[in-house]
Amino acid sequence: MRINLTFISRAALLLCAAGSSILLAQARADGQTPSPAQHAGEPAAPLVPVPGGAIPPPAPPGGGAIPGYRPQSVVNGVQITTPQYEDVFAVLDALPDAATVKPKKPRKILVYSRAQGYAHSNIPLTAFTIKELGDRTGAWSTTITYSLEDFNAATFAQYDVLVLNNTTGTYLDDPEDPARTQRRKAALLDYVRSGHGLVLTHASGDSYHRGATGLWPEYNKMVGGFFKWHWYYPQQVTVKIDDPKSRLNAGFDGKPFIIHDEIYTFAQDSFSRKNVHVLTSVDYSKMSAEDKEKEPKETRRTDGDYALSWIRREGKGRVFYNALGHSEHVLFMPKVLQHLLAGIQYAAGDLDADDRPSAK
């Protein structure tokens, strides 16, 4: 199912978000997310089935509720595709007005948003944000799909960049048809290696692994790493700008910044600076001893290297991954949207950047 999101006027948004403007102002001021409540009566259609239905969130160590937790974007086993109105308003406020570079030609982006298993609450807003980034800046046009039927070579051929929007698990697998699974996998690898772009958001780094073991080596290497553990939202970290000269980091002005989000760690053997060009990472030296102790000893990286975003070449293609964005409020930050914009333009082949591995 493909979704066409029409532009929502600012006046309409003001009416829809009545009573939430003060909350939004506070959220932007302190870096926290607005109310996690889903609007009663807010349209959830169009929807698509989600295998297995909703999965309850994990409890943080010691039990209790996760602060600021939003439920999955699933109602009665079907995936919500409509973002919340106050989130839309906040994103529109934060969007850049111009592309990082002028596109070399009209670009088309396919945003694949079907969840496998855990359907992150941020999926509808992430898809909307990518579409609006392209529309506002003229950098690309966007098609959003929630259908696995679109995951094939013929569909991919129509697009310059494929965005994997918070996919998790073995999202291409068909247990009833191994041959179909292999066709999907081959289509993805061939698409990227032939000179196209691949962009992965947050939970897309939590795919094709079981614990610390990769399940699809070619994919695991192409992506650059896979999830092992995370600090629960709202974990505070200082984001370090590893390559201040990169045009993908221009929105950060070379300055580190503090963010609150769910912070991924990547399995020791899956991520290496010998395989990717790191753009940003957690400044582990500025994390408190108490926060460091939250991570189980068995998942800690021996090198203390907790990268957040990176780029790499895969054949003739280009890959951009950003681990931030579990919480919707991350998409309210102009500097993060600049990073996403530049990352997509890099993947499309419009923005040149040093993508040699950070370590040799």
Regions of interest found by a model, annotated:
Residues 106-117:
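Short beta-strand segments enriched in small/hydrophobic residues
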Residues 86-95, 225, 229-315:
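Catalytic beta-strand/loop cores that center a nucleophilic Ser/Cys/Thr
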Residues 70-81, 111, 121-208:
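Helical hinge/lid and interdomain linker segments adjacent to catalytic or ligand-binding clefts
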Residues 1-8:
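N-terminal secretory signal peptides that target proteins for export/translocation
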Residues 25-31:
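Boundary at the C-terminal end of the N-terminal hydrophobic targeting segment
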Residues 30, 41, 46-49, 56, ...:
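Extracellular ligand-binding/catalytic regions of CAZymes and related secreted enzymes
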Residues 10-22:
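Bacterial N-terminal signal peptides
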Residues 169-254:
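A glycine-rich, often tryptophan-bearing local segment used as a flexible ligand/cofactor-contacting loop or short
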